[in-house]
Amino acid sequence: MNKAMGYKMTHDTGFAPNPFHGALTLATCKPAVRRTRGRGDWVAGFTSKALVQNAREHGVSIPYGGLVYLMQVTEEPLELSAYFNDPRFLKKRPSLDARDPEVRSGDNIYWRDADGLYQQLPNNSHEQDAKIHDTSGKNALVSARFWYFGRNCFVPPGGWKVLMGRELSTGRTFYC
């Protein structure tokens, strides 16, 4: 049976998740989600208090608990180095000097060197100190079946209880 997992997002910059270039990918952050979700499972990202506050500070109003994205994992999870080397995802490697924010926010940043150690491409979202956290997730999740709402995130009329039979969890990561 397919499982559904949600989490509260603290950032929404196009990095994690990365909804660009025809697939939504989750290759950084949320290591437990990336380690435990598989093909057919659902993952949902909701706004956290921190994300709502950050958006407000930048003149954007979004609701707490708003659905930012929903994805069904449509492929077997890819080990991070396999994701990095997959020609389909070369466009998801960040280019810091690019004018296009979609190119700057690429999430395809980890590969293994000849000694089997993870290396990290320069990027605008994660410093080297995030490498251990990110690579502990082992996998990149890929979806061709997704809905990304970003700043147009929403809470349905009547709240999540109407759709889910209960309120949205207050935890950072939860089963739906």
Q: For each of these PLM feature ranges, what is it?
A:
Residues 50-68:
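Short, Lys/Arg- and Gly-enriched loop/turn segments at beta-strand edges
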Residues 79-176:
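Contiguous surface segments at macromolecular interaction interfaces
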Residues 39-41, 145:
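Short, surface-exposed beta-edge/turn micro-motifs
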Residues 33-36, 59-63, 137-140:
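A general structural signal for short secondary-structure junctions and capping/turn motifs
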Residues 1-39, 47-52:
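Compositionally biased, charged N-terminal/linker segments
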